[in-house]
């Protein structure tokens, strides 16, 4: 999109890709974290470049977070469905323009997957943070990657790689008890090479103010 604007012959200002990771620590308010991410990711159907592209969840609270997402109307893709959506996210190595800003149910239909019409977000549970994993890319739609982290250091490492994949300087997000976990927060903000570090807040709204 930015390249197209720059080549249009008219003045344009553009920014880089986001690929925002959101970490959910085991001290986080899970209801707040999940509701915030849904609020952010469904705003404008995920077109805001600061919106969460991946959720990294500590193992201790992974199942609770997954249940909360499901209870809120998000759809967890099974392995076969995940593979189908993978093939729809990218076309020839680039983001598929047909999914940008579309509803979750529309993207599912494009992928040959059937979901309830009111589905808020499609969530693929994946492991790789490498660019070979389509879910590890910026998706600009109500599609999320969800990763399990064995501990906070593993979560930080995964987030760092996702940021590097998308390009440094954009946005990172974390949910935790900011009073008792100050050391984790300090390390997070020092390790994430992003201009915005958001704490316990929806990243779309945090990014655009």
Residue ranges and their predicted role:
Residues 3-130:
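ALDH superfamily catalytic-core signature
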Residues 2-5, 204-206:
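Short, hydrophobic/aliphatic alpha-helical segments
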Residues 113-209:
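Conserved C-terminal structural/oligomerization subdomain of aldehyde/semialdehyde dehydrogenase
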């Amino acid at each position: 999109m930015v390249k197209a604007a720059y080549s249009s012959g008219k003045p344009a200002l553009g920014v880089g890709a986001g690929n925002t990771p959101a970490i959910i620590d085991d001290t986080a308010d899970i209801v707040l974290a999940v509701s915030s991410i849904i609020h952010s990711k469904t705003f404008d159907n995920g077109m805001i470049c600061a919106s969460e592209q991946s959720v990294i969840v500590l193992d201790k609270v992974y199942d609770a977070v997954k249940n909360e997402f499901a209870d809120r109307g998000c759809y967890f893709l099974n392995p076969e469905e995940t593979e189908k959506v993978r093939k729809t996210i990218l076309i020839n190595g680039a983001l598929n323009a047909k999914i940008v800003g579309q509803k979750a149910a529309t993207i599912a239909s494009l992928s040959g997957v059937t979901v309830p019409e009111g589905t808020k977000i499609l969530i693929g549970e994946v492991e790789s943070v490498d660019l070979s994993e389509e879910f590890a890319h910026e998706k600009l739609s109500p599609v999320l990657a969800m990763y399990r982290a064995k501990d906070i250091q593993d979560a930080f490492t995964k987030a760092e790689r996702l940021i590097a994949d998308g390009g440094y300087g954009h946005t990172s997000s974390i949910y935790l008890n900011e009073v008792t976990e100050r050391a984790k927060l300090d390390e997070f903000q020092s390790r994430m090479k992003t201009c915005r570090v958001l704490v316990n807040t929806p990243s779309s709204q945090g990014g655009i103010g």
